[in-house]
Amino acid sequence: MTATVASTSLFTTADHYHTPLGPDGTPHAFFEALRDEAETTPIGWSEAYGGHWVVAGYKEIQAVIQNTKAFSNKGVTFPRYETGEFELMMAGQDDPVHKKYRQLVAKPFSPEATDLFTEQLRQSTNDLIDARIELGEGDAATWLANEIPARLTAILLGLPPEDGDTYRRWVWAITHVENPEEGAEIFAELVAHARTLIAERRTNPGNDIMSRVIMSKIDGESLSEDDLIGFFTILLLGGIDNTARFLSSVFWRLAWDIELRRRLIAHPELIPNAVDELLRFYGPAMVGRLVTQEVTVGDITMKPGQTAMLWFPIASRDRSAFDSPDNIVIERTPNRHLSLGHGIHRCLGAHLIRVEARVAITEFLKRIPEFSLDPNKECEWLMGQVAGMLHVPIIFPKGKRLSE
């Protein structure tokens, strides 16, 4: 059967770019309310963007992700805009093509490889802390959360780390620009830069991931320029925005949750597990799927050409999957959250984001154990397919640089 949703349903107006914010400036109250409705109606129809399905239940999202025949990753970004003759490699592809391309970059993102960045991340984090520790104030989002992943991603791709603002603008076009024309215009800038980088790396390859991909072959054939542009785009996107928004939300939480902060300071061995629980609660991403054939999920029948938006933050609060889902429980194990995806498209950098968060939290709490939200400035939540805190102004006792 094809279910219908009452006009009073929260699903009807659900829009990841315009999520209602609560008194704390976050959408978490709305997430909980939609979760409550999803307990009886896990999938609903939203009128936003010409109409699309909102999938909110944990098992329903799993069902969509696992059914790669009926749901294509060509709908991963929504609303969609024209990206030219290439795709968002891996994230915007389906198997068997997806698998072949993913294998090219799987090794640099393995736990063994990403653990090697720990010391580099530690140094980078402390350099950033040094830049403001004598001031006693700063925006933890722009000062730390944006910069930590941007610097590492630039190094991985062989880009100048100091051009982080440019990279974030390109990423913004994919995850936060609602206007398709504006998004395509900014995206064209990214493409032009990628073409220049690819041409340079063909003649002067380095040790970075882009050089590795450029010099690789699939079925005996070198990758086309369009494929390489797609690779550059998805590696930039996955490396910068998701981690930045997650870390921003974590700093925001630690600024006011004194009990959690002091517990992690007293027991730093809990930080790795806390990172996973914070990922469950503040996972930044939602993804779309394009329906390619008629399919029924639960009691909802979807038609070819429709889009299904997977609301991971709602599934991460599903009471059938998690005990006390509205609370941060850092001892939670196992923690089968969906914040990093599921199945064949599980986030390639899943281990890297954990390493980045673990190092950032550990080093920050060592240097600045006491801090709070700045009462004279406003925090700001960013909505979109990648959501999280955009500004987190904090104050803290002035300290000394490590170099002194």
UniProtKB/Swiss-Prot annotation:
Instruction: Tell me which cofactor or cofactors this protein depends on.
Output: heme
Its keywords, alphabetically, are: Heme, Iron, Metal-binding, Monooxygenase, Oxidoreductase
Asked if the record carries the keyword Heme, the reply is: yes
So where does heme get bound? Answer: 73, 98, 102, 289, 345, 347
Q: Give site residues, Controls regioselective substrate oxidation.
A: 242
Impact reported for residue 242 to A: Has only a modest effect on monooxygenase activity. The substrate is free to adopt an alternate conformation which places the ethereal oxygen in an optimal position for polar interactions with solvent
Gene Ontology biological-process entries? carbazole catabolic process
Query: Is NAD among the key words of this record?
Result: no
Please list the coiled coil stretches. none
Q: Please name the SUPFAM superfamilies in this protein's record.
A: Cytochrome P450
The biological pathway it contributes to is: Terpene metabolism; 1,8-cineol degradation
Q: Which GO terms describe its molecular function?
A: heme binding; iron ion binding; oxidoreductase activity, acting on paired donors, with incorporation or reduction of molecular oxygen, NAD(P)H as one donor, and incorporation of one atom of oxygen
For the protein in the UniProt heading, the enzyme class is oxidoreductase
- One Pfam family of this chain: p450
The subunit field of the Swiss-Prot or TrEMBL record says: Homodimer.
The text of the family note is: Belongs to the cytochrome P450 family.
Q: What else is known?
A: It lacks the conserved threonine believed to be involved in dioxygen activation and instead contains an asparagine at position 242. It is the first isolated P450 using the flavoprotein cindoxin (CinC) as its natural redox partner.
What does this chain do?
Answer: Involved in the degradation of cineol (eucalyptol). Catalyzes the initial hydroxylation of cineole exclusively at the pro-R carbon to give the (S)-6beta-hydroxycineole. Cineole is the natural substrate of CinA.
**What is the designated name of this protein?**
1,8-cineole 2-endo-monooxygenase
Which organism does this sequence originate in? Citrobacter braakii
